[in-house]
Amino acid sequence: MCDDEVAALVVDNGSGMCKAGFAGDDAPRAVFPSIVGRPRHQGVMVGMGQKDSYVGDEAQSKRGILTLKYPIEHGIVTNWDDMEKIWHHTFYNELRVAPEEHPVLLTEAPLNPKANREKMTQIMFETFNTPAMYVAIQAVLSLYASGRTTGVVLDSGDGVTHTVPIYEGYALPHAILRLDLAGRDLTDYLMKILTERGYSFTTTAEREIVRDIKEKLCYVALDFEQEMATAASSSSLEKSYELPDGQVITVGNERFRCPEALFQPSFLGMESAGIHETSYNSIMKCDIDIRKDLYANTVLSGGTTMYPGIADRMQKEITALAPSTMKIKIIAPPERKYSVWIGGSILASLSTFQQMWISKQEYDESGPSIVHRKCF
């Protein structure tokens, strides 16, 4: 977009990463961890310009001396003071814009508590003085980004996973299923199974190292039992990873045992169904006439769907659950890590969307509850 002064801002606040940029762009300009860090120790050097809190990449780079906190847990904001810091950082440091000059599109998890959307709305209008704002459901944006209006979205990020059936652009709320099992749980699980190998990772800073191991080395096995047998009989699946201090560790069956928890949550001591069964259950809660369209348009979205092998495994598992004649297609766009943001960018730049914004005037007249009437 040439006239940046009126471009809407699109901010996708994930539990793990915040994606932000301008409507009409094809990718977010800023992607940084949703982390606020505070020093663990007393500063002794005068004139160092030490701050009482750090956000995003700066917190990440100084993680050795900080306690890191994620203000968004399971897709829901739990610490509003820290969340304000993240938004402030987004507008002023990352995008370098004045929020009072741009409409802002925010995203939220499906089945989010109502009070949460109200608080988001309130902070945007009262703290940042935005002229207009809107809150969109993440999975719906992912479907827009894939160029569809009908399908079932399996959106799995760092904090929460949900399956959202959408028909002709409408999310079907009775069939949305939510699973509190996502990337952060997999990182914690990998920390645990690496401990069984004799490597100890305990601090919040070390958890970030394990997250990197997970992102670089893990994959989903097509057949878990068979893969376990292969790993036991040969070292062909072993990979080495160099830690920041130069020590090299070896990772074997942990590479696929970690994301296997998505399909078998019992690995984490959870009773819920895996992502394949949750997707199937979501489809089965829909009207019998639209199921065929949903099976043929199963769209993966979010960072936790980035594991190599996940689409093939989903195809195999859902085929086993569905009627034998059903055509099943899993769509895994290469940019699915950012598809929520991309969908937001598309939505906010549509001419038909311009009347959907909640304006400052409407907010002043109705208060925060306006969000339930205008955003659905």
Curated annotation (Swiss-Prot):
One of its GO terms (molecular function) is ATP binding. Pfam families: Actin. One of its GO terms (biological process) is actin cytoskeleton organization. It catalyses: ATP + H2O = ADP + phosphate + H(+). Transmembrane segments: none annotated. Its EC number is 3.6.4.-. In this organism there are four genes coding for actin. The sequences coded by genes 1 and 3 are identical. There are a few variations in the actins coded by genes 2 and 4. PANTHER family: ACTIN. This is Actin-4.
